[in-house]
Curated annotation (Swiss-Prot):
Top-level taxon: Bacteria
Keywords noted in UniProt: Transposable element
Protein's name according to its UniProt entry: Protein ORFa in retron Ec67
Native organism: Escherichia coli
């Protein structure tokens, strides 16, 4: 039985490890190929940030961010349910999940 473990060089940004095992016996058992993708861990320092901090992180102006919040392009987290002088927080966790679902990432 021969086993090879190698990295697929055709994909440069995420290494795809391929395990190929060649055995003797029936034709169905002769070749077994498994593709193992690495676990990717994404860490957020905080799940929510203020409008000012989001402006620093992205380089967008505060007016642009307020417009994006108003039309729903950026998800918000409400700290108070009665909407009295609430501090608007931008939900980075929801933005991350939304970005990853567009890339066909499976969540466990």
């Amino acid at each position: 039985m021969l086993t090879y473990l190698f990295c697929d060089p055709s994909i440069s940004f995420v290494p795809i490890w391929v395990l190929v095992t060649i055995t003797t016996g029936s034709p169905q058992a002769n070749r077994r190929c498994c593709i193992m993708t690495p676990n990717i861990s994404i860490t957020l320092n905080t799940p929510h940030v203020t409008i000012e901090r989001y402006s620093e992180l992205t380089g967008l102006s505060i007016d642009t961010i307020n417009d994006m919040l108003a039309d729903g392009r950026i998800p918000r987290h409400r700290l108070r349910k009665d909407k009295k002088r609430e501090k608007v927080m931008i939900n980075l966790a929801a933005l991350t999940v939304d970005a990853l679902t567009d890339c066909n990432v499976v969540f466990n």
